[in-house]
Amino acid sequence: MENISKEVESNDIKIDKFFEVAKVIIYSIIGIVVFFIPVTIDNQTKTILHHITYKLQVNYRGLLQLCTIVYITIGVIKSTLSKHKSNLKKIYSYFSIFSIFIVISIFYDKYSIVLLDDNISLILEETILNLITLLPLSAIFMPFILDFGLMDIVEAYCHKLMKKLFNLSGKSVLNIIMYIFNDCFCGYFMTNLLYKKGQIRQREACIILLNFSIASVSISNYIAEELNINKVNFFILSMFILILVNTILCRTYPINKKKKSYYIKTNYKESYFKSDKLINSINKHIQNKEDINIFKSMIKNFEESIHIIIRLIPNLVLIMYLGNIIINNINIIYDLKIVFSYILEILRFDNIDEISVFLVNGFFNDIIAIDLLKKNIGYTSKLLIGIICILKCTSITTNILYLETTNIPINKIEFLISYILRIILILLISYMIIYLYSIYTI
């Protein structure tokens, strides 16, 4: 009887393990397909997440616009009722009421109160609609990526390489790919989620936010088409320079001042397996897994994404509005571009004025900087601008804006320093590549 009982118990364990392994495989495939696999529907090739986003924006645009106004109103009310440490923040919170009228004007074109360029109005509208659709959708599906073993599998295969190159754990690869295949806000959400759950260190979160929040594939395609440059050369050069630049910047200020500790203490441990990586990583997940209800996890992520949107939209609208005034002021742009003009002159680049103005505008917003760029410049200058646009990783309307909603300790000065160092490195490496190419072709 004892033998029969043990045999039954053993069979039960095997069946339970089979179902756990099946869950890891099925949920991981769902996550990969939703976030990372391009699918062609209606002659458009994009990820399933982007297809759903597109359908929502086309079929329910009016509802999304109404939701935006509700979100921004809630955000403004919360901001004005909050206790602010400084009078400046208090004044800004009252000024944020103006953002409601700006959005209504953009959506319904009924008021002449908004003095925005048509281009910037269009960019702002598309940014807001993408934010309120793509971010909640990605938040809903995020548990398939984070909670059911895919992170452990990726870490097992990529940990050694990522640690040597960038001082990152192997699981960071998934977060970086999230930026590339979706958009920066989805990437920021995932970075902060990993940090809050105690799965990446403070330093790793800062590295990803400052050095790997690169432009998505769709934005990169847009840049290549707008600048009329060869996409293959453009992407290969960009990835090569990205690896070189990040290998250096992941070991310099402000990254080297960040802690190696986790946000919270958990049982999670990084692991690297020399053999049987797939089997060992799945076993590791099964042994350390928490009892997670996927539907509760989806709802929790969705709620968090809505709270983020409510905080982001009023600030995004005001920053775009004020930024429009600044970038149209020739004197301000002239004063700011001097720093970059000096570096470009030393390296003897062509089209110095155009590139330096782009670098100033790019710190505000990539798409606006590309739209304002004079396109009658040399091919090398266009290629350089495109590479910078993909790799610079910092702008006021993206990660600096999003920082207010995260637990990641990076201040605005560190963002600015990181941006300047990054631009200088990209320019130096680009100069060396151009110089070596010119010698080779002689």
Give the role of each language-model region:
Residues I77-K85, I104-N119, F148:
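Transmembrane alpha-helix boundary signature
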Residues L134-D147, K164-G187, I319, S341-L373:
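Hydrophobic alpha-helical transmembrane segments of multi-pass integral membrane proteins
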Residues M1-S28, N256-S305:
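Intrinsically disordered, low-complexity non-transmembrane regions of multi-pass membrane transporters
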Residues A156-D183, K259-K296, Y342-N351:
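Juxtamembrane inter-helical linkers in multi-pass membrane proteins
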Residues I145-S213, D371-T380:
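Hydrophobic transmembrane alpha-helices that form the pore/transport pathway of multi-pass ion
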Residues I26-G31, I200-A224, I243-V245, D366-I442:
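C-terminal transmembrane helix pair
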Residues I25-V39, L64-S79, S96-D109, L135-P143, ...:
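Hydrophobic core segments of alpha-helical transmembrane domains in multi-pass membrane transport
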Residues Q287-I377:
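Transmembrane helical segments that form the transport core of multi-pass membrane transport proteins
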